[in-house]
């Protein structure tokens, strides 16, 4: 994933015991690595849901240019989720390269 163009990544209402939260849990594992936080200044916000809660997980991304993306991770696998988040990061990377 390209974290250099993301200011804030919020992974909310993750139930660690629910199959519906699988993509959100895997995204959290990728985003919480030391390199993501230290190199890029990524602001990572997480919240866990209790085992008995039926709330759906959600992923919110705020990019460097201010664009916001809200995704329902229950409807896709981790590959599609990271692809969706990276699509706009790649656009920002291309714009930056064109300005140089």
UniProtKB/Swiss-Prot annotation:
Keyword field contains Ribosomal protein: yes
Q: Name one GO biological process term.
A: mitochondrial translation
Q: What is this protein called?
A: Large ribosomal subunit protein mL53
- Keywords, in A-Z order: Mitochondrion, Ribonucleoprotein, Ribosomal protein
Q: Which family does it belong to?
A: Belongs to the mitochondrion-specific ribosomal protein mL53 family.
Q: Name where it mostly resides.
A: mitochondrion
Could you name the Gene Ontology cellular component terms for this entry?
A: mitochondrial large ribosomal subunit
Q: Where in the cell is it found?
A: Mitochondrion
| InterPro entries given in the database record | Ribosomal_mL53, Ribosomal_mL53_fung
Kindly indicate where the leader peptide sits in this chain. none
Q: Any idea which GO molecular function terms this record carries?
A: structural constituent of ribosome
Give the quaternary structure. Answer: Component of the mitochondrial large ribosomal subunit (mt-LSU). Mature yeast 74S mitochondrial ribosomes consist of a small (37S) and a large (54S) subunit. The 37S small subunit contains a 15S ribosomal RNA (15S mt-rRNA) and at least 32 different proteins. The 54S large subunit contains a 21S rRNA (21S mt-rRNA) and at least 45 different proteins.
Q: Which domain of life is it from?
A: Eukaryota
Biological function: Component of the mitochondrial ribosome (mitoribosome), a dedicated translation machinery responsible for the synthesis of mitochondrial genome-encoded proteins, including at least some of the essential transmembrane subunits of the mitochondrial respiratory chain. The mitoribosomes are attached to the mitochondrial inner membrane and translation products are cotranslationally integrated into the membrane.
């Amino acid at each position: 994933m390209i974290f250099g163009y993301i200011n804030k990544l919020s992974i909310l209402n993750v139930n660690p015991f629910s199959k519906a939260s699988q993509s959100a849990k895997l995204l959290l594992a990728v985003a919480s690595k030391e390199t993501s936080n230290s190199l890029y200044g990524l602001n990572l916000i997480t919240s866990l849901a209790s085992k008995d809660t039926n709330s759906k997980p959600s992923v919110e991304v705020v990019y460097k240019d201010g664009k916001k993306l809200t995704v329902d991770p229950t409807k896709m696998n981790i590959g599609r989720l990271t692809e969706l988040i990276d699509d706009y990061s790649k656009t920002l990377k291309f714009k930056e390269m064109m300005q140089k």
